[in-house]
């Protein structure tokens, strides 16, 4: 599901959440270790979203596909995961706002995933979480178009890697898949 497809679905159904925020929530819950199917996914979405039950029920097949797509991206051995954000055809200020919404959603989803306050993170993951929180407060001043585009691309790549790092650190071995080893003779 693309950003534009999800945006259209949410607008048609009347959701309060943006596409970026919803994808962030789902990814945060996944990063926190939740694996949800059927009614568990529905109930988790009801708990995390501000939208009405009927809206979630109507959109559940599409939201289930988004959940599976997100999990597949986070577990992909080729690191194919990408935060669902608007494309380059969208003005930079709107992309920055969407990135802030995605990061806030990710943090909210992580908090809703049931992690205890005593969850220990590596220094790298703790720093990544702090950076994600800072990105959630991102603004746009629009000084230099080319420099701003480069900065945005770097932030987007950092966010992608940070989400994978946090997911990988908190995921069970079953989520990551079997380790591959090479035997030298």
Region spans (language model):
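Domain-length accessory/inserted modules outside core catalytic folds
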Residues: 1-103, 107-185
């Amino acid at each position: 599901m693309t950003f534009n497809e999800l945006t259209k679905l949410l607008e048609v159904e009347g959701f309060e959440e943006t596409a970026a925020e919803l994808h962030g929530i789902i990814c945060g819950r996944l990063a926190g270790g939740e694996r949800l199917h059927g009614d568990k996914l529905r109930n988790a979405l009801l708990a995390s979203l501000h939208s009405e039950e009927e809206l979630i029920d109507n959109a559940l097949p599409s939201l289930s596909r988004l959940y599976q797509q997100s999990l597949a991206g986070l577990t992909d051995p080729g690191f194919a995961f990408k935060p669902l954000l608007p494309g380059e055809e969208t003005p930079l200020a709107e992309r920055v706002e969407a990135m802030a919404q995605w990061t806030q959603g990710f943090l909210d989803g992580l908090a809703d995933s049931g992690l205890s306050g005593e969850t220990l993170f590596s220094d790298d993951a703790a720093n990544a979480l702090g950076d994600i929180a800072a990105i959630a407060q991102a603004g746009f001043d629009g000084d230099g178009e080319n420099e701003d585009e480069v900065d945005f691309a770097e932030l987007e790549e950092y966010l992608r890697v940070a989400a994978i790092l946090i997911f990988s650190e908190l995921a069970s071995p079953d989520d990551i898949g079997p380790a591959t080893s090479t035997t030298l003779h």
